[in-house]
Curated annotation (Swiss-Prot):
GO cellular component: mitochondrion
The gene coding this protein: Glyat
UniProt key word Repeat: no
Protein name: Glycine N-acyltransferase
UniProt function note: Mitochondrial acyltransferase which transfers an acyl group to the N-terminus of glycine and glutamine, although much less efficiently. Can conjugate a multitude of substrates to form a variety of N-acylglycines, thereby detoxify xenobiotics, such as benzoic acid or salicylic acid, and endogenous organic acids, such as isovaleric acid.
Positions where N6-acetyllysine occurs in the chain: K16, K113, K127, K141, K142, K159, K167, K183, K256
Keywords linked to the UniProt accession: Acetylation, Acyltransferase, Detoxification, Mitochondrion, Transferase
Subcellular locations according to the entry: Mitochondrion
Length: 296
């Protein structure tokens, strides 16, 4: 059974239900939050039954997915309480178009087994990335405060070091900056990723510091799941604390608007982990997962 959730009331019920399963449901929760608040990426939510669902998948509407090779748009967020049910649900072509290049995102690492099983059935290759999931202490206090009982907040100051404000000016990104962001984004560097970045800049808040020449020296933005992503710093401005200043600014903007604030960092990126620690962004017991799927 596939139930599309239509209208604000059903989505608000889903959001409320997903809160009970945070932080494991975070990728889906963040996406549903932004569907309720404008839905600029034209997404839809599907569940196996309603209201007592086992599995929820958020994905674009079919008319958005016109390019079979564009896995930036062909992206699915998944949360499931039941791995067996999840596999049956994801197998359906009405839920996931397995003929396309696509990506699946989830805060549940145990879905890896389910997706590997599907790979052998549907005949596609997988590239799995598992990174550290960070959530701001303010978001934790608001959405799942019980987690703070097990965390020590006494270390990070919560504020970045001051920057030279005569040299650098806090600003936001413009669509013309998409090419620069794309060049330095680990998952980007191509035409499709640039279109995706342009769409994110147009629809969501972003932060940057402009260097003396008036172009971005460091930046961060957010995607359709509400995650802070695609951050970067020009090589000549690295090691000056600019990225922590920009992330702190973006955090404040998102918190003021009531958005959940979260991000991910590679396990090998010690500098970003230290920055997260300083800004009181806490590592979660669950991970950030992405499965890039390519038909064979």
């Amino acid at each position: 059974m596939i139930v599309p959730l239509q209208g604000a009331q059903m989505l608000q019920m889903l959001e409320k239900s997903l809160r009970k399963y945070l932080p494991e449901s975070l990728k889906v929760y963040g996406t549903v939050y932004h569907m309720i608040h404008g839905n600029p990426f034209n997404l839809k939510a599907l569940v196996d039954k309603w209201p007592d669902f086992n599995t929820v998948v958020v994905r674009p509407q079919e008319q958005e997915m016109t390019d079979d090779l564009d896995f930036y748009i062909n992206t699915y967020q998944v949360y499931s309480k039941d791995p067996q049910n999840c596999q049956e649900f994801l197998e359906s072509s009405e839920v996931i178009n397995w003929k396309q290049h696509l990506q699946i995102q989830s805060s549940q690492s145990h879905l890896n087994k389910t997706i590997q099983n599907l790979a052998s059935i549907q005949s596609f290759q997988i590239k799995h990335s598992e990174n550290i999931l960070y959530v701001s202490s303010e978001t934790i206090k608001k959405l799942f405060p019980s987690l703070l009982d097990t965390k020590n907040l006494s270390t990070g100051s919560g504020k970045p070091k001051a920057i030279d404000q005569d040299k650098f000016k806090l600003s936001s990104l413009d669509v013309v900056h998409a090419a620069l962001v794309n060049k330095f984004w680990l998952f980007g560097g191509n035409e499709r990723s640039q279109r995706f970045i342009e769409r994110c800049i147009k629809n969501f808040p972003s932060s940057c510091v402009l260097g003396p020449e008036g172009t971005p020296a460091s930046w961060t933005l957010m995607d359709q799941t509400g995650e802070m992503r695609m951050g970067g710093t020009m090589p000549e401005y690295r090691l000056q604390g600019l990225v922590s200043f920009v992330v702190h600014s973006q955090d404040q903007i998102m918190t003021k608007r009531g958005y959940p604030v979260y991000s991910h960092t590679e396990k090998s990126n010690i500098a970003m982990q230290k920055m997260s620690y300083t800004l009181q962004h806490l590592p979660m017991p669950c991970a950030w997962n992405q499965w890039k799927c390519m038909p064979m």
